[in-house]
Amino acid sequence: MKRFLQFCLTLALLLAAIPSMAAVTVRGTVTDANGEPVVAAGVVEAGTTNGVVTDMNGKYTITVKGADSVLEFSCIGYETQSVTVGNRGVIDVVLEVATSFLEEAVAIGYGTQKKADITSSVQSVKSEDFNKGAILDAGQLIQGKVAGLQITLPSGDPTSSTSVMLRGYSSLLGSTAPLVLVDGIPGNLSTVAPEDIESIDVLKDGSATAIYGTRGTNGVIIITTKNAKRESPATVQYNGYVSASHWLNTPDFLTADELRAKWAEGWTGKGDISEDRKYTTDWLKEISRTAISHNHNLSIMGGTQNHTYTANLTYNDNEGTIKGTGRTNIRGRVQIAQYLFDNKLKLSAEVMADENNSKTGFNPGYTYRQACIQNPTQPVYIDNDPAKGYYETDGYFYDNPISYLNERIGMRRSRNVRFNGVAEFRPIEQLTFKALYVRKGQSSIRGNYNTHKDVSTTEQGLNGTASRGTSELVNDLLELSANYQQDFGNHHVTAVAGYSYDETTYESFSMSNQNFPTDAYLYNKMQAGMGLTEGTSSQESYKYNTKLIGVFARATYNYADRYLLMASLRVDGSSKFGKDHKWGYFPGVSAGWRLNNEEFLKDVKWIDNLKLRAGFGITGIDVNSPYQSLASMNYSGYAYVDGHWNPILVPARNANPDLRWEKKYEYNLGLDFAFLGERINGSIDFYRRDTKDALYNYSVPTPPYTYGSMMANVGHIRNQGVEVLVNAVPVRTRDFEWSTSVSFSYNQNRLISITPPKGSELSLSTNYFDTGYTGEPIQTSTHRVKEGWPIGNFFGLKSVGVDEAGKWVVEVLDEDGKVSGYDYAENANSSDWQILGNGVPDAFANWNNNFRFMNFDLAITMRGAFGAQALNFQKLFYGNPTIAYNVLNSAFDKIDVVDMTTGKPTGKTAVISDAQRYVSYYIEDADYWKIDNVTLGYNLRFKNAKILKALRVYGSVRNLATITSYSGLDPEIRTVYGDDGAFDPGTDDRDKFPTIRSFTFGVNLTF
C-alpha cells in the first residue's frame, strides 16, 4: 500500500507539472506613454513566425510555446520591447516613442544641433546607409548619397583617391576640394578607415560654412568616428572582406588575327604596324591581371560610468589590375576618455597612426597606352626569349610596356601620426569650456630606379638612373572655445565662441643620379652614381611655413520650435596674403520657420515637419601656395665675368601687398519636410554663389614692375542651382521593409568676368584663356574659358563629315562667328574654332534602395550624370587608320561624305584618311546611368550567446552596369580640374588607369 501511495503522489506531481511545459496563452494591452492604446502593434514570439496584432483597443491574445518564450512588441514609430513570458498570463506593455530623425544630432561645426532646428543646408548620412563593399575612402561611403556633392573615382589606380566637388567651380587658381574634418580636426577622406566611421555630415551653404572662414568655401565634410559610450559593455568587432577586380571594359584594338586580316584586305598600315613579325601577343593581357584585395578591421570599445575606451586596427592590401601596382595600408586608433568631479571635467586623448606603401616605379597609365598601341604580331622578347632582351623598335613614343613593368622599380612610403588631447570643463549645466590641442606629423620617402635594361637608359647609353626624395610636414592646432545654452520658457538660446591657431611647416629634399656600377643598389646608394662627378645629377630642397589664426562666434535662437535664427562670424588672418590684407571677415546668417507648429497646421496630423529656411554667408578662399604676395628671384642663364661663367639672378615674381582673400557670397533658400510619421521626408534647396576677387595672373608693365606678370584679385565666378532630396519608406512590415532615397541636383556655372578694371596697371590681351592639351602629335588646346561662358567648354573645329578621299571637312566662320562655308580641316585656323560642348554635367541624380526580408538585406545604389560631353582621347588618337601604331577597330568606321559647298551628306561614306585632328567628331554625349553598388547580406543575432553576439555575411558588386551611348570605356570622367589648374573637364585621357569592376565577399562579427 505504501508503494502504491508513493506512485500516486509521483503521478500527481507529474500531472501538475504538465501545464507548465505545455503551451501558454497570454493576454494583455499595449499602450503608449499617455495611456492611449497602440493599434496594430505586432506581438511576436521571438525566433518564430507566431505572431498577432493588437486590436482597436490595443488588446491582444497569443499562445506561445512555454514560460521561456520571449514576446517582442513593435510598432512603427515606437521602440521595440522584448518581454519573457514566465508564469504570467497577462502582460501589459507601454511602448516608448522611437527617437524621431528630427531629434537626431547633426554636426554643424564646433557643436551639434537637432535636425529639426537646422536653418542651413546640411545633409547627414549614418553608417547604416553607407555604401558597402571594397570601399577606398570616406568619399566612396557617401557616393550617390548627398544631393549636390559630386564624388568621382574615374580611375582603377589603387593609389588614387576620390575627387570631390560641391556646387561647381568656385575659383580659377584655388582648389575645389571641401574642408574635411575628422572629429572636428582637419584631415582628408583617407584619415580614418571607412569601417571606423559612424556618420558623415555635409555642410553645403555659406551660412553653415562661414564659421570656418577661409576654409569653408567649397563646403565642409564632417566625419564622426565610432567611439564608446559610457556604461557600455566591452564589444569586439571584426570586419573583413576579400575582393576581386578586373577592368570594367577593354578597348577594342586590333588583335593579331584582325591585323593580318586587314593586311589581307589591302590595308598596309604605317611604321611599326606595317610589318607582320610572326607572333601573337595580347599586350593588354600581358600587363593586366585579376586583382585580389583584402581588408581586415578589428575594434574594441567599452565604458564605465567614469571612463570610455576605443581601439581599432585596420590592414588593407589593395592590388591593382595592372601588374606591379598596388598599395598596402595599416592604420590604428586609440581613444580614451575620463570623467572627473561629478562629470564636470572630461579629459580625452587620442592617437592615430597609419603607414602607406605603394609601388611607383612606372606610370601605369602610360604603360597602359603603350600596351594599347603595340603591334600584336611582335613578341615581348627578342625571339620570344627573355634572355635575349626586350623586343624594341625605333617608333616615336613607342616602347615595350613589359620593359616598364620589369625595369622601372619604385616605392613610396608615407607615415602619418596624429595626437590630440581635449579638456572639457562644465562648471554649470549650461556652460562648457573646451580646449583642443592637435599635433600632426606626416613623412614620406620615395625612390625610383630605371635599370640598365630600361629603354630610357639604353637609348641614352646610361647604366641606370635613380631618384630619391623625402618630405616632412608638421602641423600644430590649438582651439579654445566656450559653449553656452539656456532655455527661457519658449526661448532656447545657444552660443559658441572661440579662438584657433593653426601652424604648418613643410620641408622636402630630392636628388637624382645616373650611371651606377650595378642595378643591385636601386635607389638606396645614391652616391654611387657617376652623375655626381659628371655634373649630370641634380638636387633640390624646399621649405615653407604658414600660419592661420581665427576668432569665431555663433549664436542660435529658437522660439517655441517655430522661429529659428542662426548668426555666425569668423575673422581669419593668414600669412599667405599681402601685408595690407592679412585679415578677412566672414559672416553668416540663416533663419527658419517651422510651419507645422503654427496653429493653422497643428491639427494636420500627417505633417511632421514643414520648415522654410533662408541663409546667407561669406567665405574665403586661401591661395594654394605660400609667399605669393612676396617678390622672388631665380637663376636664369649665365654671364661671363672676370674669366668665369656666373649664373644670373632675375626677377621671378612681383611683390603684391594687396593680394587678398577670394570671397564667395552665397544665398540659399530651402524647404525641409516630413510626412506620414516621417515615412516621407526630404529637402529642396535653391542657391546662388558668387566668387568675387577671384585670383588670376595678369600682365603688368616693366618697369615699374620687375616681372611681367602678377597674381591679383579681379575675377568673378557664379554658380546657381537646385538640389532635391526625398527619402521614403513605402513598405514596413514585421518581415519586409523597403526604404528608398532619390536625389537630384542641377548646377549652372558661369565666368562673369576676368577683365581688370579700367585704369588698372593689370592687363589681359583677351577676355578668355585657352586650356587643356591634346599632347603629341596634335598639340593644341581643348577648352576655352571666357567671360560670359560656362566653365568647361570644349573649343575647336566643328566637323560635318569627310570628302570622298577621307579628309575632314569643317565649318568655316565669318567675323560674327556664323557659318559662312566649309573647308578642309587642314586649311582652317583658330578663327574657325567654336564651342563644341561642355565637359561638366548639368545635372546629377541618385536613387538608393534598401530592402529587408527576414534576416536578409539588399542594397542597390544607382546614380547618373546628364548634360555633359566627353572628348574620347583613345578614339581621337587611335581611331584613325593612318597612324603608325595599332588602331581601334572603329578606325575603319565609315563616315558620311559631305558636299563641300553645302556641308550636307551626299549619301556616300568613306574611311578617315587624314592626319589626327582635334575636331568635334571625337566629342560625344556622355550621359550615363550606373547601377553602381549592389550588396546582398544575411544577418544573425545570438541573444543568449556568451561569445558571438552577431554575424553578418554579404556579397557586393561595384560598378555592376552602365547605361550610356558613349563609345569610350567609361563615361564617368574627371570633371574636377587637375593639380595643374587646367579647366579641362570631360577629357577622357588615353593614359587613364582603366576603371574597374569589383566583386566582394565580406563578414562582420560582433563579440
Language model: regions and residue ranges:
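Surface-exposed, extracytoplasmic segments of Gram-negative outer-membrane nutrient-acquisition systems
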Residues: 454, 640-652, 690-714, 749-840, ...
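Hydrophobic beta-strand positions
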Residues: 30, 53, 179, 686, ...
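Short hydrophobic alpha-helical membrane-anchoring segments
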Residues: 12-23, 79, 359, 677, ...
